Amino acid sequence: MKIKTRFAPSPTGYLHVGGARTALYSWLFARNHGGEFVLRIEDTDLERSTPEAIEAIMDGMNWLSLEWDEGPYYQTKRFDRYNAVIDQMLEEGTAYKCYCSKERLEALREEQMAKGEKPRYDGRCRHSHEHHADDEPCVVRFANPQEGSVVFDDQIRGPIEFSNQELDDLIIRRTDGSPTYNFCVVVDDWDMEITHVIRGEDHINNTPRQINILKALKAPVPVYAHVSMINGDDGKKLSKRHGAVSVMQYRDDGYLPEALLNYLVRLGWSHGDQEIFTREEMIKYFTLNAVSKSASAFNTDKLLWLNHHYINALPPEYVATHLQWHIEQENIDTRNGPQLADLVKLLGERCKTLKEMSQSCRYFYEDFAEFDADAAKKHLRPVARQPLEVVRDKLAAITDWTAENVHHAIQATADELEVGMGKVGMPLRVAVTGAGQSPALDVTVHAIGKTRSIERINKALDFIAERENQQ
């Protein structure tokens, strides 16, 4: 049997981390079994579904490289198919038309609640033989079995059972002729030959209804697996303040897709004590029986740690392709400066996100208008004039511009003046970067370049001279 899974989001908002994790688990299960992964857009909620949300879902899936083998399918383009199946069910007697008014249904609901009963349809039209005009408004309900129970073996939670007496007759077509969500899902899973449905635990109560409809259609019943919810680190339902933002917001905030995928796969699944997983390892090791039944806690610090790891572990040339977008957002012209792959090597240890990296690198490519006030006050003092002049001249004399030779020039300056490296290094750092912090000074000066470094040292010497004149 060919394994076939699906990810079926509703395009009423962005692709959030919970949806992304569900997509990842479905994708991994299919890949682990050499099966196929289907993308289906469940856009039957015409009022809330938007083209922008569909685009956001696609963008998120593509950024995470969760490529689909079929689709995307759109439910709104399949209404003829759904209605044909409903008409077939009406003929076979597994569905019936219901003419009950909203007023009757509301009165029934209030009466049941007053008695402490669970609100449910009482089946009046199921057994009615009244004649109705063809154009009289009605809904179509599924004739749910009235005896027995529905049992399914959830691949994460184990056997789950629902009594059919707890399930009323579900509306499968509205008065306007549009099919309802639970029915569309059933027909889609049937037509698309889905073998395994992996989705959030909020769908557990839909499952017995969907199984009963599938059985009425004499269609195969897929295997179900319901993934637990994601909470914030305080144990409360995940919300924006915990980090429940769109997948693309993580891109905007400077995270690598590998980091987010690695974080999401471990958010409810484990393989021994291993924390770092390549995509290939995820595919190789992923099983549903290793997915936890308990809710997972979202921890931004852990995600940040993983991101820092991947910035330094992945090939710099690859990381640079993602950094490029952030550089463009900062409007930095990188034509006159180090290659982005070299920048990744320079700043990788210091920066935990690509956004931080893009906001920390401008001095490598563009001259700064002024020095950081605190750094200049502390390090660009008259006592720094001589070290800067000497190191400038030694840098100017370098014929083979390498980080090693830059280091020798700084060391030689300290030796010549009989001062510690800090007496040379700190003024030089402020002079060439405009600030008091940077990667190792020799590689920083080397990356900035010989001509630009000397020009900036001269600018710092002018700053010191002006400072002296003002005293």
Swiss-Prot record:
UniProt main location, coarse: cytoplasm
One GO MF term: glutamate-tRNA ligase activity
Reactions performed catalytically: tRNA(Glu) + L-glutamate + ATP = L-glutamyl-tRNA(Glu) + AMP + diphosphate
Residues that, per the record, bind ATP: 240
Cofactor note: Binds 1 zinc ion per subunit.
Catalytic class of the enzyme: ligase
Span(s) of short sequence motif 'HIGH' region: 9-19
Residues that hold Zn(2+) according to the record: 98, 100, 125, 127
Motif ('KMSKS' region) on chain: 237-241
Family: Belongs to the class-I aminoacyl-tRNA synthetase family. Glutamate--tRNA ligase type 1 subfamily.
UniProt-recorded name of the protein: Glutamate--tRNA ligase
Source organism: Escherichia coli (strain ATCC 8739 / DSM 1576 / NBRC 3972 / NCIMB 8545 / WDCM 00012 / Crooks)
